[in-house]
Amino acid sequence: MSTWHLFSDSSGDGFRWEVAGRILQSVSDSTPTKALESTAPLPSMADLLLQGCSKLIEREESMPGEIPMFRTGLGKSVVLKESSIAKAKSILAENVAYSDLQNTNCSIPQTRQVDTAETMPMFRTALGKTVPLKESSIAKPLSILGSDMIIDSDNVLPRESGFGVPNSLFQTASNKKVNVSSAGLARAKALLGLEEDDLNGFNHVNQSSSSLQQHGWSGLKTHEEFDATVVKHHSGTPGQYENYVSGKRSEILNPSLKVPPTKFQTAGGKSLSVSAEALKRARNLLGDPELGSFFDDVAGGDQFFTPQKDERLSDIAINNGSVNTGYIAHEEKTSNKHTSNSFVSPLHSSSKQFRSVNLENLASGGNLIKKFDTAVDETNCALNISKPATHGLSNNRPLASDMAVNNSKGNGFIPRARQLGRPADQPLVDITNRRDTAYANNKQDSTQKKRLGKTVSVSPFKRPRISSFKTPLKKNAQQASSGLSVVSCDTLTSKKVLSTRYPEKSPRVYIKEFFGMHPTATTRMDYVPDHVRRIKSSNADKYVFCDESSSNKVGAETFLQMLAESGASLQHASRKWVTNHYRWIVWKLACYDIYYPAKCRGNFLTITNVLEELKYRYEREVNHGHCSAIKRILSGDAPASSMMVLCISAINPRTDNGSQEAHCSDNCSNVKVELTDGWYSMNAALDVVLTKQLNAGKLFVGQKLRILGAGLSGWATPTSPLEAVISSTICLLLNINGTYRAHWADRLGFCKEIGVPLAFNCIKCNGGPVPKTLAGITRIYPILYKERLGEKKSIVRSERIESRIIQLHNQRRSALVEGIMCEYQRGINGVHSQNDTDSEEGAKVFKLLETAAEPELLMAEMSLEQLTSFTTYKAKFEAAKQMQMEKSVAKALEDAGLGERNVTPFMRIRLVGLTSLSNEGEHNPKEGIVTIWDPTERQRTELTEGKIYIMKGLVPMNSDSETLYLHARGSSSRWQPLSPKDSENFQPFFNPRKPISLSNLGEIPLSSEFDIAAYVVYVGDAYTDVLQKKQWVFVTDGSTQHSGEISNSLLAISFSTPFMDDSSVSHISHNLVGSVVGFCNLIKRAKDATNEMWVAETTENSVYFINAEAAYSSHLKTRSAHIQTWAKLYSSKSVIHELRQRVLFIIGACKSPSC
């Protein structure tokens, strides 16, 4: 490790810094020495201290024992005592000779040698405890990193920086230095394709250093000596290591022709050797990816940069907007190209200095320079972006990058990094596919932001040839063109932080908290200019900021250029991307200025705010990968049915040809509006009801809508929102049942909170699917089965009848199949007996064995070939027989109408709307019936009457009835019960089931459902009436016995189903006469006044139970027990007999009691 010492300057009034190392040499009076800095990526502590100094130490008198060398940021002197210097030397010192300042006025430092033979206090713990380091510990890593680089105190290979330390050009990730031998450098040169004279192009540079001496530096060498530089001290001997240095220099620059094989490592760590010949053939095959065709017609002896005069290298500055460090970036120079570097004094700050290259004499290379200028001009024309003229910004002050480029162009010099469009300040790409590989320069530039996210190392041999490839020593600063910064391939993939607003360091303030009122509450617009009032979402992308002091105008193109100069990637921040976001930002800020003029006062719609918004959006979308709601829907990452808040930005938006769609009538459903989430937009088609709301003025531009359960039309594959808005083929499908008005301050995008259910009373029958609603269950009807008979015919049966139909269907199928099989077997035998002409060997054997009396004896005498043919033929015969039989059976069943039945189970549920307890208005809840197709087992068993449920996935059906009819699929619908605590917030809605007796049947209104338990007096025969099969059942319950009225003791129940010719199943069996049966869900009809009896009829939802223990009829259990007790009484038998005779009399007069 090198150390820095203080020396008095020549005048004796000031001080200067110099480097001290292991190798001590005398100072040459005739030729001042120069020390070039190391290219190591991690500077030493001394380097860091030197970088912090921004100007020369001012000369001032100091007190004895104090050295006024450092100052604070405010310019205040910091007293530095000798004890502080001693403490610093104890930290920075190594096992080398370092100087000791005896007093502040000494001009020649006195050198003393530190004895480090046993211990070397180079490392310390976190608590400050010294960790001894012996030379034996150093020998171990040296043996691993390179046996030919053993360090001793007498013979040390000087590195390029001139420090007397090992040639540690590379460092590991933990800052451990890795020594590189000459053989390693030769392999690196063979890998990078360098020729023997690649480093000889700098021999023409003069060794003058007059400009550097002006700053008090005398320890720096010229480019000619950069590879063999040593630090010469006053106490050394001149020329002590000249022979050694010269030999090493020639060994590095002119290696032998026999280059050792280059070794690569695979991802698994396996070492592979590649010879120089193989690499040469690979380069010949792939071509030179860096130079292309620029040097095809240039003579090999031409030098691009051959200055003949004494030039000041420190005057060459290449500035790309970053702060220059105190390092000298060394670069390998080839015979065909040259890139100059700028040296900055450690005591000077050059972050804002612009210098020019004074090139007076150039070699014969003018033709080549013209080629480079032509290539750069073609690159600028390809970008086709003009220089920005921003409003509110200085148009006369050139950019730092432009100044550097202009200075370079003026001298006929264009940096090679700019020519090839690649950054020159980044390390070599990893070619081993290993993450633990150490590089010589593995740190990013100090002015670059750290890349966000994970980085991936990919072998450059697997990349396209257009990918950039550069050596670790290339440190060129990237130049900017006169119009737009050149963005290379590496810069496109980087994630440079443009905005510090995200992530937010403090809670964000939203418009409701900032403005505190609805936009329509303000009417004064005195502060809003006319051109701002005319801004709409349709023309916001064309808006430009005008500079009052000049005729410059700033629009979307200018902001694109600003983003690119800020470091944005043109791959992501494309022209379409910037124009789209510029449109929505301008429209939003203009709306703030228009609707809140008193508070905004025109300070929102400014260039600064627009640029900051663009940077913020780039940071979130590109660097952090955040996507808005519309972008996620179009990319397929989120369903369109998700709940989101969007804003109406335009009605009937423009199509591709710019024409406007005409307004549709009230019955039209293809009216489109443009919706935006603030970042992107897409079209949306309105249904019939929403179209009526639009025509009535209830939908307008600027209104926010809460959308849930929307559909997506025209979408097939992931699509960019910038392309979708142009094609206008993809649109959202909105319906009124899933579209609600949102609060004016609601945030756009997906909603994190749970959506509020739509009130059951607000559901429109033709308003599309209902995303979520809340209702109470009043009745759950039994499971029914619907069979589709073809030709749009179907029949609905109860569970009991369906079981009988299944049994009857299976019996008919079995009888038909048995008959077909018997006939088929006889037909097959007859056909086989007549097949005497079959010449196949297996068929002959089969026929012989079939007709033989003792086939076993014949088989015993057969040969192996005969048995094999017989077995094969028999297998074929059985398979053909089985296949033909199956086809015949299927055809016969199809002809007989006994094929597979298409039956779907379903259940009906009666719902009612809810009314809040806080509602003081009229309580008129709406009723509805939901049909669940293919209900799940959970829905069959867990749904309970009297509970409130949150339902999802219901679709209303068009109906003119006051009752709302909906349907749903069992697998797609969701039924979530509401908690009992929340259910208490609604008014009661449920009337529990209870048995009705004949004595109080008159209290029930007509067409109402009721349940009754009754004694079956008589079961009539089934008959057909107008395409329906009917059957009458007469029952009584004995409730009128105490009053002595016989006239009102009968109830006639009509069972009816659609007529079917093949159905011989009756509703009620005659065996039920004399039994007590429970009837549920009967409909009350008008009373038969002629025969003085009550009348009721059944529907598809009606059901009866013989067993009162059934769960569905449990409420009839007590009433059924009382009726059974009454029927067993002796007095009741006469009443039952009299009622039966009366029924027979009515039936005898006509076939129907209604006659």
UniProtKB/Swiss-Prot annotation:
This is Protein BREAST CANCER SUSCEPTIBILITY 2 homolog B. It comes from the Eukaryota. InterPro entries: BRCA2 (IPR015525), BRCA2_hlx (IPR015252), BRCA2_hlx_sf (IPR036315), BRCA2_OB_1 (IPR015187), BRCA2_OB_2_dom (IPR048262), BRCA2_repeat (IPR002093), NA-bd_OB-fold (IPR012340). One of its GO terms (molecular function) is DNA binding. PANTHER family: BREAST CANCER TYPE 2 SUSCEPTIBILITY PROTEIN (PTHR11289:SF0), BREAST CANCER TYPE 2 SUSCEPTIBILITY PROTEIN BRCA2 (PTHR11289). BRCA2 repeats lie at residues 63-97, 116-150, 163-197, 257-291. Keywords: Cell cycle, DNA damage, DNA recombination, DNA repair, DNA-binding, Meiosis, Repeat. Gene3D superfamilies: Nucleic acid-binding proteins. CDD domains: BRCA2DBD_OB1, BRCA2DBD_OB2. It comes from Arabidopsis thaliana (Mouse-ear cress). GO terms for cellular component: mitochondrion. Interacts with RAD51 and DMC1. Interacts with DSS1(I) and DSS1(V). Can interact with both RAD51 and DSS1(I) or both DMC1 and DSS1(I) in a tripartite complex. Involved in double-strand break repair and/or homologous recombination by mediating RAD51- and DMC1-facilitated DNA repair. Plays an essential role in both somatic and meiotic homologous recombination. Is crucial for the formation of RAD51 and DMC1 foci during male meiotic homologous recombination in prophase I. Disruption phenotype: No visible phenotype under normal growth conditions, but the double mutants brca2a and brca2b are sterile due to aberrant chromosome aggregates, chromosomal fragmentation and missegregation during meiosis.
